[in-house]
Amino acid sequence: MNEKLTPSIGVIGSGRVANAIGLLLHAKSLTIAFVHSRNTESGNKLASKLNCPFIASIKDTNADIIIICINDDEVQSTIEQFSKDQKVLYTAGSVDIKMLHHEKCGVFYPLQTFTDHTQKMDNQFPMLIEANDKELFLDMIHLCEKSGLRYEKCNSEKRKEYHLVAVMLNNFVNHLVYLSQQEGDVLASTIAAIYHRRMSEAGLSIHSEDVMDSVLA
């Protein structure tokens, strides 16, 4: 049986998620066809890292699969600009795939918090995937396997729950870290460390920036 051909990938966005996913795919020798971003400066920087062109107009983009790494509230209006037969993935955690009405649409949601543009994908946290097209779903599995990513099939309803829990826990732990750092609250420090470890073991990323290093010391 012939090996499945790896599709070319377009990246829309130039923020933390776009950088993490783009750099991982590029490191695994997948073809990045372009980067498009409303932020020309950061978009050009990412394109340079991925050794691909920066495309200023979304109308000029072309790739087998386009990964949309932008704010949740901008996903629908962006997807609507593509033809129905264009395969698109988005990384938003709270957007229900049924609300988009795009024929070949998928969710490529990393259950991981990214603190800056240099943070890499962590295989400890799974990629939650969903698609309304069988061929696209198989493409997503192929991408995950090619790039060495853990993945789990997850519908929009369940993904929203995970996303909400991750955000709530993230905020809770950050508050505990603040108390421990600003007010010397030893109990808050201990609880924050416990939650951080437990959630990491469960596959939920918690972002408390560099201060967590001292809490876990």
Label for each model-derived stretch:
Residues 1-56:
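NAD(P)+-binding Rossmann beta1-loop-alpha1 motif at the extreme N-terminus of oxidoreductases
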Residues 5-8, 85, 124:
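Phosphate-coordination loops involved in phosphoryl transfer and adenosine-cofactor binding
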Residues 8, 31-34, 87, 104, ...:
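Residues at the starts of beta-strands that form the adenosine-phosphate
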Residues 10-11, 68, 129:
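Hydrophobic Val/Ile/Leu positions in short beta-strands of Rossmann-like dinucleotide-binding domains
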Residues 15, 40, 72, 108, ...:
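Electropositive phosphate-/nucleotide-binding environments in soluble metabolic enzymes
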Residues 40-45, 49-120:
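Rossmann-like NAD(P)(H) cofactor-binding subdomain of soluble oxidoreductases
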Residues 42-49, 119-161, 165-200:
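Internal alpha-helical scaffold of NAD(P)-dependent oxidoreductase catalytic cores
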Residues 182, 195-217:
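Interdomain hinge/lid region at the active-site interface
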